């Protein structure tokens, strides 16, 4: 599989290195506005070739050179000095729209995975700029937030993370929320599990911990990396290996939850054709209202910077 990565910063590097370590790409090409950084990241990953499952061809190139890629990950942007991902939209929307159009004009026929923040609005932008069907433009959405939730709950409940099936919906940002009615632990709905295995914790505190986790990491080391790198590569793996795996990603709302014309996160089946099926969960009235609030926040910001 030929993988293209736009943006060779911390996140772009993490995606490329993880893809090489997992053996899900045979050819990885970087692009960055700083060409020397793209070259350096490619060479650094190539230097570990002896430790990968198979040889991975590493290179760097222009937007036009991305035309032959099977999957392109857009990892552009920066959270330096920013405390709300939505602030990045005005900063990077024009550049993103321009390079997407250039890549598509060069003949790209694959799948876009949009990671750069604000990833919901950027996925919406890539969808419109590319002219691709929604199945071939996927936002990383709340996939990472959901793994953060699972990790938080597994520590509170003292169980393995794989035994928790959490759900974070809405925007990948300040208006995201935990859909508590859809959390399962060892195949039991959370409330039922807690009746049998009592544990005391504040749900509001859990939501805040999940929402603020990225900022705590950024404050400490300047960027997030490992979580998002593995999250995106789980999406790539599901597509490349046609796993039909359900992952919380951002997709175009076309009537689900009575929402329309915006990218938001919901469980989606990922396979060889990209986003193959979006799943509408049964939510409480409060959860539906919070999801609609996310829609309003994103649409307001899209309109603001039109």
Model-derived regions: residue spans:
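Rossmann-like NAD(P)-binding element
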Residues: 54-111
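NAD(P)+-binding Rossmann beta1-loop-alpha1 motif at the extreme N-terminus of oxidoreductases
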Residues: 1-41
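Short glycine/serine/threonine-rich phosphate/pyrophosphate-binding segments
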Residues: 11-15, 82, 119-124
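Short, well-ordered alpha-helices that flank and scaffold nucleotide-derived cofactor binding pockets
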Residues: 17-21, 43, 47, 101, ...
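C-terminal substrate-binding/catalytic lobe of Rossmann-fold NAD(P)-dependent dehydrogenases
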Residues: 130-136, 145-306
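Glycine-/Pro-rich loop/turn segments that contact NAD(P) or position catalytic residues
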Residues: 87-104, 110-159
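Conserved N-terminal Rossmann-fold NAD(P) cofactor-binding segment
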Residues: 33-70, 84, 299-304
């Amino acid at each position: 599989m030929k993988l293209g990565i736009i943006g060779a910063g911390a996140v772009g590097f993490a995606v490329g290195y993880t893809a090489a370590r997992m053996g899900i790409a045979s050819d990885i090409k970087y692009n960055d506005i700083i060409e020397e950084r793209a070259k350096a990241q490619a060479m650094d990953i190539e230097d570990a070739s002896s430790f990968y499952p198979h040889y991975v061809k590493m290179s760097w190139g222009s937007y036009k050179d991305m035309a032959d890629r099977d999957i392109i990950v857009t990892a552009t942007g920066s959270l330096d000095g920013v405390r709300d991902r939505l602030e990045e939209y005005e900063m990077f929307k024009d550049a993103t729209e321009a390079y997407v159009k250039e890549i598509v004009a060069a003949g790209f026929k694959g799948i876009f995975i949009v990671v750069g923040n604000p990833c919901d609005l950027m996925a919406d932008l890539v969808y419109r700029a590319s002219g691709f069907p929604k199945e071939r433009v996927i936002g990383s959405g709340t996939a990472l937030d959901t793994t953060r939730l699972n990790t938080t709950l597994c520590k509170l409940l003292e169980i393995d993370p794989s035994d928790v099936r959490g759900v974070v919906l809405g925007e990948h940002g300040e208006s995201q929320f935990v859909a508590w009615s859809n959390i399962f632990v060892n195949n039991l709905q959370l409330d039922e599990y807690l009746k049998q295995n009592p544990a005391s914790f504040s749900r509001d505190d859990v939501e805040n911990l999940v929402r603020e986790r990225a900022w705590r990491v950024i404050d400490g080391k300047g960027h997030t990396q490992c979580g998002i790198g593995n999250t995106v590569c789980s999406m790539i793996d599901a597509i490349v290996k046609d796993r039909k795996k359900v992952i919380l990603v951002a997709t175009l709302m076309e009537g689900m939850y009575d929402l329309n014309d915006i990218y938001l996160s919901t469980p989606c089946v990922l396979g060889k054709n990209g986003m193959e099926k979006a799943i509408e969960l049964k939510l409480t009235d409060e959860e539906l209202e919070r999801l609609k609030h996310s829609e309003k926040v994103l649409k307001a910001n899209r309109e603001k910077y039109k």
